Amino acid sequence: MTKKLHIKTWGCQMNEYDSSKMADLLDSTHGYQLTDNPEEADVLLLNTCSIREKAQEKVFHQLGRWHMLKEARPELIIGVGGCVASQEGAHIRERANYVDIIFGPQTLHRLPEMINHVNGTRSPVVDISFPEIEKFDRLPEPRAEGPTAFVSIMEGCNKYCSFCVVPYTRGEEVSRPCDDILFEIAQLADQGVREVNLLGQNVNAYRGASYDGGICTFAELLRLVAAIDGIDRIRYITSHPIEFTDDIIDVYRDTPELVSFVHLPVQSGSDRILTMMKRAHTALEYKSIIRRLRKARPDIQISSDFIIGFPGETQQDFEQTMQLIADVNFDMSFSFIYSARPGTPAADMVDNVSEEEKKQRLHILQERITQQAMQYSRRMKGKVQRILVEGTSRKNVMELSGRTENNRVVNFEGAPSMIGKFVDVEIVDVYPNSLRGVLLRTEDQMTLRSHESTASVIARTRKENELGVGMYQP
């Protein structure tokens, strides 16, 4: 009888990536098949996020529901992973002693051994250590699930912003070796992936070892990924302003595979608040980066993160944030009301901004960003956009849906054979959350570079070093 696995995921794209790797890993080692129904699962995994307010209580609320399943089936295995597990591992066991496995973001690769231990001894396992980059060496080969894919290039963060728990839950920055990343992306390209999203808490801090003993920078990695046959679009999240260096900006000048859209969190437009947040840059320095980016790629569009109501934020501080939003003309944003994260320096600050004031400021900010986004969308009407067709439309199963470079959803009429390929459409209608297009040309009518498999490229360019070791040298 097939064993079933249910994974519930909260939080960032990195958590989504980790959950997909858990599923692939347990399928390869134990034959577990994913199910959306927790009642039929043999293993329940909760991949948690500690960014939002009351994250811990949300975890215990979910575990309470699963506890009833455990009482009915004592052999059911319940595991809690992610950032809340990393931060609150011991506390989770104290409050929910029926949880069998507690693991952190850096130890998910040990899940097979943990499950074997629980099955063999019926005793719990807690492993929330930070074993560097070991987990990537233990994960199964990547499996494409459509024309886009996410690839983790690094873990952790060294910035220690005063409001953020990431350094405490995911550890400090550790970069994957360059060749490992390129090989994973090449494998995905061979499976039909056309767009790759590079993931990390601070991707532009990437410093990965290369095969020759050197260090590969993020700018160099972007160019190497762009050279992989079959990869026609590159995105990345998330980056930090203080490491958005000129060599990264230069990639936007000469690498068309890198999309004209960048997410660059700023959090506030007030230098006083930025200092309290320990962001290590000013609003003017942030605007300087954007100015250089737009000089390198005039059509680039910018999204950002904003924290509203940080302790001590005055009306003047908020107005400076609104001025920055107008000056940069952000296209999109992820904006949230500040909530203290236990263990962070900001949690000890006096939170003297009323909830009503926070909500009002958030509403004003989001309204402004929405207006600016609609202005960008309206400018696209009548223009030709190249989109990567991802599948059928959510609005109408008889239509197709894809995304533009600037991350807008476009619905249009087309044939199923277009899924996974690029098409050019004319934008004819603009809606708040999507665009409507009319098909103009398909991929075989474009002048895209021809695709050659990775195996073929390696065979054609293979060389041996002085030790007789085969190497791929582009």
Swiss-Prot record:
Keywords carried by this UniProt record: 4Fe-4S, Cytoplasm, Iron, Iron-sulfur, Metal-binding, S-adenosyl-L-methionine, Transferase, tRNA processing
Domain MTTase N-terminal: 3-120
Chief location of this protein within or outside the cell: cytoplasm
Superkingdom in the source lineage: Bacteria
Residues engaged in binding [4Fe-4S] cluster 1: 12, 49, 83
Keyword Disulfide bond listed: no
Cofactor list: [4Fe-4S] cluster
Signal sequence segment: none
Gene Ontology cellular component terms for the protein in this record: cytosol
Catalytic reaction(s) noted: N(6)-dimethylallyladenosine(37) in tRNA + (sulfur carrier)-SH + AH2 + 2 S-adenosyl-L-methionine = 2-methylsulfanyl-N(6)-dimethylallyladenosine(37) in tRNA + (sulfur carrier)-H + 5'-deoxyadenosine + L-methionine + A + S-adenosyl-L-homocysteine + 2 H(+)
Subcellular location: Cytoplasm
Xref: SMART domains: Elp3
GO molecular function terms listed in the Swiss-Prot or TrEMBL record: 4 iron, 4 sulfur cluster binding; metal ion binding; N6-isopentenyladenosine methylthiotransferase activity
Ranges where the TRAM domain occurs: 378-441
Pfam families the record matches: Radical_SAM (PF04055), TRAM (PF01938), UPF0004 (PF00919)
InterPro entries: Elp3/MiaA/NifB-like_rSAM (IPR006638), Methylthiotransferase (IPR005839), Methylthiotransferase_CS (IPR020612), Methylthiotransferase_N (IPR013848), Methylthiotransferase_N_sf (IPR038135), MiaB_methiolase (IPR006463), rSAM (IPR007197), rSAM_horseshoe (IPR023404)
The UniProt record lists the keyword NADP: no
Domain Radical SAM core, first and last residues per copy: 143-375
Similarity-based family: Belongs to the methylthiotransferase family. MiaB subfamily.
Subunit (UniProt): Monomer.
Name this protein carries in UniProt: tRNA-2-methylthio-N(6)-dimethylallyladenosine synthase
Naturally occurring in which organism (per UniProt): Sodalis glossinidius (strain morsitans)
